[in-house]
Amino acid sequence: MLCPEKLTTYCFKSGQVNELTARLIGMAFTSANIFDTDLPQPLTLNPWQLTPMLDFPLKNKQGGVIENNGVFALLHQEHPDWPLILQSGNDFNEVYVQLIQRLEARGMRYVYLGDLDSAGIQMADQFARLLKQTQAEEVAALQQPTDVRLWLADLGKIDARRTKQRKVVSPVYQAEMTTIALFWKFIEQEQLMGVYEVRITEWLEATEV
């Protein structure tokens, strides 16, 4: 058990969704039900709390990584037992990167969910490239290229600025980036909440250790 006075927490009040500030996201690691502690969830770790958490006991060895903090908050509110990790902004801060890589080395399995626009796909690709033992196809398991094509056709919004081609490395994300650029359409995470709830449930059941 961690001492509350030594660990910063971030809690959501029942019936209300509060989002973390961009400044806090940019310097911290926020997760729910990843570490085996009885402190309120979600849990936000600051840089000076990194070292003791690298080997802290785990509650789960699965983590759904969510790009947008509003969607993270909604999913946690509706499914308070799900293991979730908030993507740490665009800068991939040092605390976040070290914990993501250390958790993977300890057996953590990840799946990534983000906006289906150029920036979101690039961020997903960057996350996948942090990992040493996990293929990008596994990270993209719940948002595969075939899914992206179908969702863009049904739900996509036209925006040339948000669909410009950007450089990505992983073939799975190259395919998704190409599709977005060809369609000139994007999708925000909030539009896929119903899909997320079904797919995350199935993924957690299929990958449970």
Predicted regions: what is each one?
Residues M1-S88, F92-E104, A119, D125-Q126, ...:
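Nucleic-acid enzyme cleavage-core boundary/entry regions
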Residues M108-D117:
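Acidic beta-strand-to-loop metal/phosphate-binding motif
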